[in-house]
């Protein structure tokens, strides 16, 4: 209601400026903060502020003053005590005191050893499989008399030759 009364009391030009401010609020906040800092820091040097920016800063100053008048805290010393005083912690008689963590009795290294051996065994199987596949590939290469590089099968070679012939340029 207070804002509505303020808007009614402002002139039409000021309302247009407020609409502009509302539309560009993020950019305006940065500019307004910058201009206020600049205005406070430069007492002797004149500022290059457009009339529209000056009106905006005046309107915002006015609105902030009105807001601060209406929402002023009651004067007096600041409250140092919290609203609800903190009660000291009291331990109930059936609550047991905190004990430091104790490891259960037994061999602590056993689970880790089991995990390590399982992981090691799976790595060993993978190594054996890769060795086996390498051996099979080597045997296949020896049987065909080919070197170890991969080559296309004969049918694939023929298909690719036909495609090349299809797009060849004939003079």
From Swiss-Prot:
Induction: Expressed in the late phase of the viral replicative cycle. Its main location: virion. The keyword Ion transport does not apply. Residues 68-124, 139-171 are annotated as: Disordered. The keyword Thylakoid does not apply. It is found in: Virion. Keywords: Late protein, Virion. Residues 141-160 have a biased composition (Basic and acidic residues). GO terms for cellular component: virion component. It comes from the Viruses. Belongs to the asfivirus H171R family. This is Uncharacterized protein H171R. It comes from African swine fever virus (isolate Tick/South Africa/Pretoriuskop Pr4/1996). The lineage of its organism: Viruses, Varidnaviria, Bamfordvirae, Nucleocytoviricota, Pokkesviricetes.
